């Protein structure tokens, strides 16, 4: 994944959409690799909410994610990966009509999140139950000086995303 957007002047909406798509591409490319590294005990994965792009979809997804973490944590990573895979599809097809609670419910069900939990998505999102969590995650991210997502740290050092552009590059970097 390369940060091509850094050298191009884009209007804020286009820039935010491109940054979100790059994050979705990264997460989709590395989902299986990250799962394997976790299963093998080679990494610790910490997913933190971060709303740096100002998109309404982020509010929907973060509130749903907070609920999944609280009520069905065993499926949180699968849900996370499925949300980014769906977002990438939406961005590639330029179909913002799919940025809905109903889409998140379908994604959650596909990812194995219990129906009892996905049935709570609408109320959780409408009440903005996890907004304080998202705000705290975003403030922490910014206070640490991070600028974009995804942010990858290996042995405490932030990784340049150009180092992890292949599907096995995280594994190679960690095994160095």
Task: Give names to the regions the model predicted.
Residues 22, 109-176:
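C-terminal cap of thioredoxin/glutaredoxin-like
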Residues 1-28:
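Local sequence-structure signature of Cys/Sec-based thiol-disulfide redox active-site neighborhoods
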Residues 13, 40-43, 147-149:
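Extracytoplasmic
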Residues 3-4, 25-96:
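Structural alpha/beta surface segment adjacent to cysteine/selenocysteine redox centers
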Residues 18-20, 89-90, 122-123:
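A short, structure-level motif marking secondary-structure boundaries and short turns
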Residues 6-16, 36, 106, 119, ...:
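Polar/charged alpha-helical tracts
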Residues 29, 33, 59-63, 67, ...:
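Extracytoplasmic/secreted proteins, especially bacterial periplasmic and envelope-associated proteins
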Residues 10-11, 92-99, 107-112:
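Short, exposed beta-strand "edge-strand" segments with a Pro/Gly-rich flavor and a Y/T-containing core
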């Amino acid at each position: 994944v390369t940060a091509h957007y850094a050298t191009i002047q884009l209007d804020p909406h286009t820039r935010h959409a491109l940054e979100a798509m790059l994050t979705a591409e990264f997460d989709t490319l590395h989902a299986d690799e990250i799962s394997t590294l976790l299963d093998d005990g080679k990494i610790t994965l910490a997913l933190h909410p971060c709303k740096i792009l100002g998109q309404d979809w982020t509010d929907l997804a973060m509130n749903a994610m907070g609920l999944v973490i609280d009520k069905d944590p065993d499926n949180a990573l699968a849900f996370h990966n499925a949300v980014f895979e769906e977002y990438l599809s939406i961005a590639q097809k330029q179909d913002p009509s799919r940025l809905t609670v109903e889409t998140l419910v379908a994604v959650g069900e596909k990812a194995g999140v219990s129906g009892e939990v996905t049935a709570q998505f609408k109320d959780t999102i409408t009440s903005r139950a996890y907004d304080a969590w998202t705000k705290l995650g975003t403030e922490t991210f910014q206070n640490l000086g991070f600028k974009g997502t995804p942010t990858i740290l290996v042995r405490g050092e932030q990784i340049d995303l150009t180092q992890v552009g292949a599907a096995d590059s995280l594994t190679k970097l960690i095994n160095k």
